[in-house]
Structures are given as C-alpha cells and as structure tokens.
Amino acid sequence: MAVKSLVFRRKFPLLVTGSLLALQPVAALTVQAADQFDCKVSATGGWDCSPLQNANANLPPRPAHTATSVSTAAAGSSVSGSGGETVEAEPTQRLVTESGGRALKSRSADYSHLDWIPREKLTAAQLAEIGPYCGGSYIEPVRPGMDDGAPSDESPTYVSAKASRYEQEKQIATLAGDVVLRQGSMQVEGDEANLHQLENRGELVGNVKLRDKGMLVVGDHAQVQLDNGEAQVDNAEYVIHKAHARGSALYAKRSENAIIMLKDGTYTRCEPSSNAWTLKGNNVKLNPATGFGTATNATLRVKDFPVFYTPYIYFPIDDRRQSGFLPPSFSSTSDTGFTLVTPYYFNLAPNYDATLYPRYMAKRGMMLEGEFRYLTHSSEGTVNAAYLNDKDDHRENFPDYSKDRWLYGLKNTTGLDSRWLAEVDYTRISDPYYFQDLDTDLGVGSTTYVNQRGTLTYRGDTFTGRLNAQAYQLATTTDVTPYERLPQITFDGFLPYEPGGVKFNYSTEFVRFDRDLDDNIYLNDDGSEWGRRPDAYLQGLARSTGDRVHLEPGMSLPMTRSWGYLTPTLKYLYTKYDLDLDSQGKRTLTTYDETFDSSQDRSLPLVKVDSGLYFDRDTTLAGTQFRQTLEPRAMYLYVPYKDQENIPVFDTSEPSFSYDSLWRENRFSGRDRIGDANQLSLGVTTRFIESNGFERASLSAGQIYYFRDRRVQLPGLSEKDLALMRSKNPNLDLKDPDTDSWRSPYALMGQYRFNRDWRVSSDFNWNPNTSRTESGSAMFHYQPEDNPNKVVNAGYRYREDSRRFNSSTGRFEYGRENDIIKQHDFSVIWPLVPQWSVLARWQYDYNKNRTLEAFGGFEYDSCCWKLRLINRYWLDVDDDAFLNQNEKADRGIFLQIVLKGLGGIVGNKTEMFLDKGIQGYRQREDQAM
C-alpha cells in the first residue's frame, strides 16, 4: 500500500467557521469564528481578531474526558458547568495495554470505531472480497480527500468545528464539537482541539481519529505537528483496511513519511472480538509504503499464551514479498527418519529472488537446496541446486551410487527478439536413486527421469524453424536408457499463395537418435552376479542408433459453407534412415528374425477426404429452450501398406483408442511407423445450447470401418512376432491382435452439465467383435462458481486395451491381466459450518485389490488463522535391484497451521498432495486469496 507523506505549511493560516472552510496561504480573506470573533490575516501571516459586539460569550460545554487524557483542559476528576455546579467525570477509559490486544468494546460495542462492518450489513461486492468464514470486514468510509494525490505543499488545509474561540495574545485557536482537520489525504478528528500557531502544533482531545490512505488510528488524545504531518495518538488502536489487520499501542506515532511507530504495540489479522493470535513487541514499526512491519522483543501469542519469542521480527502487512523464514515443515518416513525443513526466502529485487531450503534428516544428515528465480524484459528462468553428504549406507554397494548426492538445474526462456526464442531445461542428478530416497522442494516435474533440453526457435511469417538438443537422465534402474535427440532440426510452414483456394504446406525433420547402453554385469563382493541394467537384455534392432530425415509436403482444398465443409487432402510422406547397430545387436538379430540394413527409406502417399455437416433446431426439454445441433462427420483415409518391420523404433508408440482416434491420419505417434489405412470414419456430435450460450450437454459417437487388415505394427505386436514367440513358448499367454476386424470399437464421448456447478463427463469404447468394453471412464465434478469451497469428485476408470513396452525384452506387448486398470477415485472438500471443512480422497485399484492413496482430515479456517490435520496413506516406489521395482506403503500425519498475515507456521507439504489429489482444490485456494 503506497502512502504519500503529508507536509503541512510552515505557517498554518487557520480558517474557522461553523462548517467546512478552506484557505490558501497567500489569500487575504476575511475570517469569522463561529459568531465570536472577526479575524483577518495580518501582513505577517498571523491573526488580527476582534470580538464581535453582539457575540455570545459562551461556547458549548466542553466534553468531559478520561483521566488518561493529556489535555490540561480535561484534567481532574470534575469540571464546572455553566451554572457553576460540579459535574463528575465519566468513568476512566480502559487502556489498550490492559485489553490483551483486543479491540476496546468500551469505545463502541459493535467496534464501529474501527470501521468494522458486520457481515450482515456488507454489500454483495464487499462480501465477494472476504471468505465465507469471516464475520465482517474493515470498510474505510468515503470522505473528502481520501484519494487526494496532490503534493502536500500544494494542498489546502481544511478545518471544521461546531464552535471556535481564538486567543490573539497566545495565538491559540480553540475548536469544539466534531473537529476535523484535513490536508491532502490525511484527516484528524476529535471532540475538541487547540491549534498553536507559534509552534505549528495541534492538540486534539476526545474520540480522536487519525485517517490516512487505507489506515485508521483511534485514541484519546493526539498531538499533530502542522508543518510536517507528524502525529502522536495516545491509548491507540489502529486498522489497516485492505490487509484486514488491526492492533493497539500505548501510543502510536506517525512520522513525516507516514510510517507508524507503536509503543508496546500489537498486530493481528483476527476480528475485533477475537485474539486467536497476536504479535506483541516493545517497539513495532509499520511502513505502508513498503508493505512490511518490524517488531523488537516480539512475542507470538496464541489465545494470550506466549508460544514464541524473538528479539526481532520482520513481517508483511500486505501481499508484497519480503525476505525471511517461510513456514517450516516436518515429517517422518522410513527413508529419512524425522525431517525438518526451514526455508528462508531472499527478496533480492523486484525481478529476482532466491530461496534456501535447509533440510535436516535424522537418518541422512543435513541437506541444502537452493533456488534462484529471475525475470528480465526478455527472459525468465530458475537456477537450482542441492547437496547432501548421505550418512545412510543402505545403497552403499549399489552401482552408480555415491555418498555425495547432488542435483543442479537450469530453466530459462529468452526472447532474443520478436522472432527468435531460446529455451533451456537442464537438470542433472548424482545417481538414479535420488528421488526414491530424497524429497525435493525444487519443483522437478518427474521423479523417473530428468530432462536435459535446449531449443532455439525462429518464427517467420509463413514458417517456423526449430533447433533442438534433448537428452534424458534416468532416475530409476528399471527402465531402458532413452534415446537422445542430438540434434533435432524441424522446418514447418505453408506457402503464402493459394491458387484456386488450394493450400500448400510442408513439414520437415532431421534428427539424430543416440544413446549409450549400459551392458555391464555388476558383481557382489564374492564374485557372483548382482544384477544387470535392462539395457543388457535389448537385442537386435532395439539396439540401433542413427539419423532420420522426414519430408511431408501436402496440399488441401478446403470448401466451407455455413452448413458444412469438405476438405480433400493429399500428402507425400518420405523418410530416410542411416543406421548403426552394435555388435551385440547384430549377433542377436536372429532372435526375432530381423534384418539390418544401414540405409533405408520409405515413401508413401496419403489421401484424406474430411467432411461434415451442421444442422440445428430449436427444441424444448424439461421446460427449457435449447438450440440443438446435429453435426455428422465422415472421413476417408487411404495409406498403402509398406513393410516397416526392419525399421527400428526410436520415438513411436500407439495411443489407446478413443473418439479422437477416428480422425487421426496416423494411428501411431512418431514417424517410425506409418499405419496402412483404407478406412472410413463415421461420427456424429449433438449439442444442447441455451439462449445465453451455455452448453448444457454434448454427446459424440463414432466408429471406423476398415476395408483392409492393418498389417503395420510395433515390434512384438505383429502376427509374425506373436507366432514366433508362441513357437518358443507355447504356454505363453499372449493376446491376439485385433488387426483383421472390419470395424473398430464403438467410441463414445459425452458431457452433461446439470448447471454451472455440476458436471459429469464420460468416454466409453465397446468392441462389438469381442462383445467387451475395452475402456471407459466416468468423472463427476461439483464446485459452485459462487462458493468454490465445496468440491466433490467421483470417478471410475477401466482399461484393458493398453500396450506397453517391456524393458526386459525391448519390445512392445499387449497388456496382460495384471495390467488392466480398474480404479475408482473419490475426493471431497465440504464445509460442515462456515469455518469447519472435511477433506478426503480415496483411490483404489480393484484389479490388484489395493488402495493407491487415501487421506482424510479436517480444516478450520477463519479470517485470521487456518489449521489442517490430515492422515495419509500412499504407495511409494523403490528400486532395490535391477528389474526389481518394489512398491511399499507409506503413512503419515500432516499438520498445517497458517497465521494469516504472518504466513504458515508448519505444514506446507500438505499443499502438494492436496493440489495433486483433489480436482478443484487450486481454484478454491485462489478464490480464498
């Protein structure tokens, strides 16, 4: 919150009337003082006042004030009334230092003196700014000058009061009754005031309020320096409106630059009637210009009980970043024992920062992780690193293991100019067991491999060129070493002219696939075999490396109307390979009856005719008007067969069948296999759209009709491969490929929205040839737009048509019984009352009769603090030996405490699994922010 300091004039040219008046210092104006004096500005800038002849000599009675007031006018236990009688003073105002940091109810029973508005009196717009668990909000009232941004030396001074008196000899103006002083954005109010012209000082007594941009200070007595805006308010309470923060102090001082100093001050985000937590310090400083506060000899109190002491603390008073400790987290697992992480954040500059993560692990020692982030006008990125001298000896004899365990990485995106873009994503780890043994706070995307990629892209008007170098480092010992692309060059685009509406486009690629296979046999101390990498089991063409060039020119003629379209397409697909095969690969070619040719090419035409129609009508369902669409689509695809069994597979797989598969040009991903096709895809989509554009429901269904068997397959899935494997092992349970059927499974995809809060989506694939469901899923999601705190997810997934890569053979195979997916996933966040919610998730695998993850707990949330307590069970993966991947169950109890305005105290790790496990959790938290 930026606050501009207020500077009063050196000479305070007072203008007093019975209402609000203004005066510029150079103006020679006539002044009247509430029918008491006739005052004029003298030549020296002082006052020249004389009593009016018919003036009433009596001012309204002076308000009685507390014994704590510094004003001499209010001192003593009694005052004299107009008739000379003695009037007893009102009961002594309670000191804020005696209230334990709570707001003084004696000033107003409903805390309106702090601009507190209860929830039931807030407007709809104001309610949208607070959580459902908040009982109200601090609302700054609209007042003249509150948004005044003019320089203080150019701002006039305004004074108003019900009555006034001026002592010319002492040059003191006395004001009484609803006194208001305002200059620029600063305003001071009180029951009465004395303005000392010689000292440029004002003294206000009774119900004092000092307002500045977004801040209010309330007290019994105030001293204001009129030439620079300094002020002191005694027995003070304060509010920072936007931060929803308040506090109190023996006295509060406002400096010339609008910094607030509190003596024996408190700070909290709790509501006026509550003190769940309070930060108390001998000297507290609040700087609205920077958004931070400091406190010395500070004590954190929870329910008035001291729980933490620090000689100095630096804390935020708004949402701006600051250096300091972040919420620590602790846990206990079998791998690390008790773990404590105490992150420290460095706010180095507006465009770069750093975070240090000291991680103490009882079983492994002290690990240091660090992250540096930067942002410039043309680039952004992250640099991270970690180091641990591991004292755990569990993997002491494992290959590729060292007690010095480390990680370093760089992510960078740089726009060299409007057309050139450079990207780097490089991470390296010390050993393949790193993520199995150690947690990380560095945001690594995968725990089975790390990416090592650099890309340079140029975007022209009609083309895009890209130079890419990409490698991977495995973080497991049970997978085959992946291929590296060193380099990969692509050039894609279209011709700028379209003769007769014909569009010409092209796609080109050159890539070098390489990898270093690990064929070593690792031995135990006694000389026996300990294990081998999966690389050692690769045979034949699976051990190939080489270059691949792919050219794909094409032309199409889109013909589009409002009622439909027809687009014929013709492409030419040419691929050339220059291959290498090591000696072990050549020796084992006969294993799968393969042939190696170092130079191969493949050329194929592709013909596609895509067409669709669009129909719509107005209809009524359940009393609601809809626009229903009917969108039939047909696509014919022809690609001739060409034998590709002796071409190795570098980056190709076959995605699972779905409704989107109907419209693919190639049933394989990657370019090492181009599927033969002579087929017609038919599909239809219908939608129900309301008059406001809201799509209530959609349903799509379709099927492919084959005019020829699909002969091109991945290694291990062709009829020849399956026959060869059966001949070697007649008892082998192998699934027959569905390549000679004249039709595909029926593919369905649908979505229905009960309203904007409830929706269900589903996909379903049923094979009429086997009368079996090959895959399907149904997902239900509930999250109201106006109350995203309510979240319900329920889903079920089934799939038995998967294909997987077998690292022990280096070939693909159909999923076996153990690979069938039958899982349900249920998660919920539900408020029981505005402040209490339950959180839970249960993910279960019916095929293996086991729980994959389950957690449950509760959350308490208020305007000033939050608590979560969650019990969690989950499966972890651990490589104890080559080709031996063990799954083990972990359990943990996670506690998270957040003191709003100070940040979390413990347990930020809960955020990670809640965000990953519950769809809608992030939207809920973003709305709360």
UniProtKB/Swiss-Prot annotation:
InterPro entries found in the cross-reference section: LipoPS_assembly_LptD (IPR020889), LptD (IPR050218), LptD_C (IPR007543), OstA-like_N (IPR005653)
GO terms classed as biological process: Gram-negative-bacterium-type cell outer membrane assembly; lipopolysaccharide transport
Region (Disordered): 58-101
UniProt key word Signal: yes
Keywords, sorted A to Z: Cell outer membrane, Membrane, Signal
Compartments (UniProt record): Cell outer membrane
Job description of the protein: Together with LptE, is involved in the assembly of lipopolysaccharide (LPS) at the surface of the outer membrane.
Similarity comment text for this entry: Belongs to the LptD family.
Gene for this chain: lptD
Extent of the signal sequence: 1-33
Subunit record text: Component of the lipopolysaccharide transport and assembly complex. Interacts with LptE and LptA.
Gene Ontology CC annotation, any one: cell outer membrane
Biased composition (Low complexity): 66-90
PANTHER family named among the record's database cross-references: LPS-ASSEMBLY PROTEIN, LPS-ASSEMBLY PROTEIN LPTD
Protein name: LPS-assembly protein LptD
UniProt superkingdom: Bacteria
